[in-house]
Amino acid sequence: MSNQHTLLTSNLLPVGSNISTWWNFGSMLLTCLMLQITTGFFLAIHYTANINLAFSSVIHITRDVPYGWIIQNTHAMGASMFFICIYMHIARGLYYGLYLNKMVWLSGVSLLITLMATAFFGYVLPWGQMSFWAATVITNLLTAIPYLGTVVTTWLWGGFSINDPTLTRFFALHFILPFIIISLSSIHIILLHNEGSNNPLGTNSDTDKIPFHPYHSYKDMLMTTILISILFYILSFTPNLFNDPENFTKANPMITPQHIKPEWYFLFAYGILRSIPNKLGGALALLLSIIILTSAPFTHTSHTRSMMFRPLAQILFWILATAFITITWTATKPVEPPFITISQWTSTLYFSFFMINPMLGLIENKITNTNTNT
């Protein structure tokens, strides 16, 4: 068994010797996924998908179920940690040009969309005030679809408004989608190991590869330990750090919150949606804010893969990162000046990255060729 283990780790999983800590987020995401599925299973045992009982069942879990408060808070906080890791993972991919491994990148974008759908359905389940109104606003965007919008929305709601059938549907979808995420994750990993992982330099690693275990597996274990430590530190001292105060009140369709917003990890897309004063345009912009990631492999023009050697592209990347954070911040604010203007400008900067980066690549190629010729 020992020889088989050595053969597997040495020959099937060789990795470039110079990959950095940024390459540890994949294993951290797998840890988050396992944690979410485990805690989610125990929550599903005690949860009741009924609009009159859902809120009470969540309170019952935290108060009466042994260690229920740990399970519930770990699941809620784990979702935030999951998205922190996945945004870091995507940022690493954009910075180091890992999107050129097209199939891995496209499967990753599919994973992101599935994960966001899963998190959205899960956010509605406690049937708190903000959960209810966020679900109402977001699902109502489907009515912007020409011809089919009203039919699709009515089918999703299970009626003419968000009610008991809607909650049942959302619970069923929230339960089944993680298994689709597992399948997509398996495809993502298989495709990655088919071509092999890249490195920070963006060069071919074939001449300098080392066994994944023990050299990189211990790095993964260290980062996973740090992740779990941070998770349980927040869980112990500030368990409601990312929770909305409105969600501690049971959903009331007769009272609208002053400011409706989804969870923080959707705020960048929600901010882009709000920056466009048109329902269909906003819905398309929201969808495009995620779908535009699929364009990265097809619009790469630079001869250099990694941004490590592209100073102009680095500036553009950090403008994107700043725009992302700023959109998230403005989406937490009321829809009034100056937040509307800031949101519109930062949304423009967000999309500009994917349009300017190809042109910047061509300019860099021109500069490089000129210097080489002289």
UniProtKB/Swiss-Prot annotation:
Record GO cellular component, one term: respiratory chain complex III
Binding site for heme b b566: H89, H188
Binding-site list for heme b b562: H75, H174
GO molecular function term, any single one: metal ion binding
Keywords: Electron transport, Heme, Iron, Membrane, Metal-binding, Mitochondrion, Mitochondrion inner membrane, Respiratory chain, Transmembrane, Transmembrane helix, Transport, Ubiquinone
GO BP of this protein: mitochondrial electron transport, ubiquinol to cytochrome c
Complexes and interactors: The cytochrome bc1 complex contains 3 respiratory subunits (MT-CYB, CYC1 and UQCRFS1), 2 core proteins (UQCRC1 and UQCRC2) and probably 6 low-molecular weight proteins.
Name assigned to this protein: Cytochrome b
Organism: Calliophis bivirgatus (Blue Malaysian coral snake)
Gene symbol of the encoding locus: MT-CYB
